Amino acid sequence: MVPVARASLFTLACLLVSVCAQNFPGPPPGAVLRGPFPPARPSLTNRVHPPTSAAGMQLMRRMAVSEAVLSSDYTKRMTALDAIQNIPCVFRNPVLKYLLMDYMDMKPLPLPGSVQSQMSPATQSMILTDRGRRLQAGKLLNSRCVQSHDRLGALMYDIAEVPMAASAL
């Protein structure tokens, strides 16, 4: 019995609303509403966002680039190849070039004039281990070459196994 009463009460309320809407249609289109309106409450649509700092914006951009670069092995390899071929400071830095070639699984041969022969013997022996590669990549993270190229930076963070969020600290 109660559901029937609720349904009839709801029907009656709907009828009353439609009659009131016909008798009192509201302001004409384009009319300016005046009066004391309560302030809008914060919601998902009108929430005021604090201004983001330049460093925060740069970190967000770097993380987005990192996510795009590191999304697949193909994009990692293509980014490394692009860096080796098109960024002059990578071409001039034998350690950086070796790390990127190693990242693409292209082991450079230790021939005279090759990338390995341009490194010091201590660096050559250290870079052959995983820990040494991570250490060298970590050192290169602070270089101007890596910091000025976001995609290269994403690869270096991946080689050094440093999460991008830790770079903000």
Swiss-Prot record:
It comes from the Eukaryota. Component of the acid-soluble and acid-insoluble organic matrix of calcified shell layers (at protein level). Residues 1-21 form the signal peptide. Its main location: secreted. GO terms for cellular component: extracellular region. This is Uncharacterized protein 3. It is found in: Secreted. Keywords: Secreted, Signal. The keyword Secreted applies. It comes from Haliotis asinina (Donkey's ear abalone).
